Amino acid sequence: MMTQPQPLAFRIGLGYDSHRLGPDGPLRIGGLDVAGDFHAIGHSDADVLLHAVTDALMGAIAGPDIGRLFPDDADENRGRDSRDFVEEALRRVNEAGYEINNVDAVILAQKPKMAPHIDSMRAAVAEMLQTTIEQVGLKAKTGEGVDAVGRSEAIAARAVVMLSRR
């Protein structure tokens, strides 16, 4: 007779997203509009940071990815605010009996410069996740002229989350 496994005390999830960039701003990232010469092209608001965080949360609970939760061919997701995605992922994390220990993310963008916006983005993400700002790490890196990010043709983000059993 097989016994039911005990729920894991900790779970880790990894998320990634990228979008092509188009002319004219603003760029929506971390739930904020960042002024600049570019905007991300996508079916929703194309917020790469929130998409990566959503996938990290869903991955940590072995849930479906953002594309299965919010298909890009569904009309209701056209122009949709990515905060909705984070909200649904957080609801599922809570429903699974977990809470967020911390989130760490990196934004990959040549332009616009992210450094002036990092603290505001950390605060916005912490509020969305119902955590403290100390639980949200965020960095930004440029592409140094290499690949689509470095040529300002794309923007990307990676996120990792650690959950603990409540």
From Swiss-Prot:
Stored Gene3D superfamilies: 2-C-methyl-D-erythritol 2,4-cyclodiphosphate synthase
Site, as annotated: Transition state stabilizer: 43, 142
Protein's pathway: Isoprenoid biosynthesis; isopentenyl diphosphate biosynthesis via DXP pathway; isopentenyl diphosphate from 1-deoxy-D-xylulose 5-phosphate: step 4/6
Family annotation (InterPro entries): MECDP_synthase, MECDP_synthase_CS, MECDP_synthase_sf
Catalytic activity: 4-CDP-2-C-methyl-D-erythritol 2-phosphate = 2-C-methyl-D-erythritol 2,4-cyclic diphosphate + CMP
Chain sites annotated for binding a divalent metal cation: 17, 19, 51
Molecular function as annotated in GO: 2-C-methyl-D-erythritol 2,4-cyclodiphosphate synthase activity; metal ion binding
Protein residues bound to 4-CDP-2-C-methyl-D-erythritol 2-phosphate: 17-19, 43-44, 65-67, 109-115, 151
Group of enzyme by EC: lyase
Co-factor note (free text): Binds 1 divalent metal cation per subunit.
Cofactor dependency: a divalent metal cation
Keyword terms of this UniProt record: Isoprene biosynthesis, Lyase, Metal-binding
Keyword check for Lyase: yes
EC number(s) from the headed UniProt entry: 4.6.1.12
Biological processes annotated in GO: isopentenyl diphosphate biosynthetic process, methylerythritol 4-phosphate pathway; terpenoid biosynthetic process
Disulphide bridges: none
Record-linked NCBIfam families: ispF
Role of this protein: Involved in the biosynthesis of isopentenyl diphosphate (IPP) and dimethylallyl diphosphate (DMAPP), two major building blocks of isoprenoid compounds. Catalyzes the conversion of 4-diphosphocytidyl-2-C-methyl-D-erythritol 2-phosphate (CDP-ME2P) to 2-C-methyl-D-erythritol 2,4-cyclodiphosphate (ME-CPP) with a corresponding release of cytidine 5-monophosphate (CMP).
Sequence similarity: Belongs to the IspF family.
Quaternary structure and partners: Homotrimer.
Record protein name field: 2-C-methyl-D-erythritol 2,4-cyclodiphosphate synthase
